[in-house]
């Protein structure tokens, strides 16, 4: 039987296309198989993760974390309940280990190591209040040893932590006992680190520290530093400006207004010194108290016609009065 040329071409073409169609059908079936395999693999990964997570030992939690990381490498783009649970575990585990590591370094007084651990955490999470707080503590204590290498960073961390507190973004006070204690310490530390280079900002920080419901409200050192910062900062600046603008010139309304501002700053400084003396009640504080009292007497006399009359009464009653 003869097959026409046209029919032969049709049959031949059909024969050539059959493998293609067959492959196409096969390709359409494979995703279903792949999806099943993926689901099975995903369940296996999750089951392994749960097996380790159920056991509360440190080693099992570490293994669960490794399982979770592998799970997210394969299925991190998914958003089902299991994937969300794994992501939550990773976040909480990393938070715990970071806090443990940074606390260990800080507890050992290895302040440089504390910063090494904290820096990359803040790069990923700039508003991590816990880390900002620990680094401020570490940086402040490092400065007390005479090492100023961490001061610049500590100042920035303290400013950021204070901003978070002032903006109401801090819901958990850790590493501090309370938000007020955090506000007190952070401002005291900031003021202490700035008191030489920027006394105006330092005075503002010390004022916030003593106004907080924290131990710094009754800390004589905080009040003494507040008084010194007022004198070295705004009082000195305004006095220099006053002498330049109004020295040996007739009085004027502008001159009087500036003079009144300077006088008020002096009164604020005296008040801070007086509170420092009044709050120095323990035997261990007596040597420091006597030094501050000598400074206070000279300062008070300058503003009271070279007389210290009324100073003792002021010391006795100052704690019953509000800050000026």
Describe each PLM feature range.
Residues 51, 71, 101, 135, ...:
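Structural register within alpha-helical repeat arrays
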Residues 65, 115, 155, 203-204, ...:
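Tetratricopeptide repeat
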Residues 21-108:
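N-terminal leader/linker segments that initiate helical-solenoid repeat arrays
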């Amino acid at each position: 039987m003869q097959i026409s040329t046209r029919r032969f071409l049709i049959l031949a073409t059909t024969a050539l296309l059959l493998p293609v169609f067959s492959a196409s059908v096969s390709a359409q079936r494979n995703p279903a198989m792949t999806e099943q395999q993926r689901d099975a693999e995903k369940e296996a990964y999750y089951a392994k993760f749960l097996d380790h997570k159920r056991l509360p030992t440190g080693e099992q939690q570490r293994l669960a974390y490794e399982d979770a990381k592998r799970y997210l490498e394969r299925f991190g783009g998914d958003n089902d309940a299991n994937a969300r649970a794994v992501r939550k575990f990773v976040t909480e585990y990393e938070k715990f280990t970071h806090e443990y590591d940074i606390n260990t370094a800080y507890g050992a007084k290895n302040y440089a190591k504390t910063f090494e651990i904290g820096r990359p955490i803040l790069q990923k999470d700039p508003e991590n209040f816990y880390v900002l707080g620990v680094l401020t503590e570490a940086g402040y204590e490092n400065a007390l040893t005479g090492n100023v290498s961490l001061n610049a960073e500590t100042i920035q961390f303290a400013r950021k932590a204070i901003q978070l507190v002032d903006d109401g973004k801090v819901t958990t006070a850790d590493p501090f006992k309370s938000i007020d204690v955090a506000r007190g310490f952070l401002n005291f530390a900031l003021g202490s680190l700035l008191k030489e280079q920027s006394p105006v900002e330092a005075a503002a920080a010390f004022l916030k520290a003593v106004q907080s419901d924290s131990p710094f409200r009754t800390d004589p050192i905080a009040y003494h530093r507040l008084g010194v910062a007022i004198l070295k900062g705004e009082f000195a600046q305004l006095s220099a400006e006053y002498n330049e603008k109004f020295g040996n010139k007739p009085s004027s309304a502008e001159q009087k207004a500036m003079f009144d501002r300077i006088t008020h700053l002096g009164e604020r400084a005296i008040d801070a010194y007086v509170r420092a003396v009044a709050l120095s009640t323990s035997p261990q504080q007596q040597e420091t108290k006597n030094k501050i009292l000598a400074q206070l007497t000279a300062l008070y006399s300058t503003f009271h016609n070279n007389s210290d009359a009324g100073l003792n009464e002021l010391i006795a009653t100052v704690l019953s009065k509000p800050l000026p």
